[in-house]
UniProtKB/Swiss-Prot annotation:
Its main location: cytoplasm. The gene is zapA. PANTHER family: CELL DIVISION PROTEIN ZAPA. Gene3D superfamilies: 6.10.250.790. This is Cell division protein ZapA.
Amino acid sequence: MSDGGKTKTTVEIYGQSYTIIGQETKMHMRHVASIVDDKMREINEKNPYLDINKLAVLTAVNVVHDYLKLKEQYEKLEIQLKEKE
């Protein structure tokens, strides 16, 4: 870790190196990068003619969609738990 409790690590996403600085562990940041890389490759398999910018945007849209679906499920579970109390 560097000053201020921040961690710096280099990751590879879709063949490009990125330096990421954050408060999470290197392992966590690498895991996040791996998920992004996997998602980009998954989308590229289905749409091999997309340029890198469109691929990145579609990846972001897909990841946010997945996040929102999980958030909705979490909120429903919270409501169900409160109803049982």
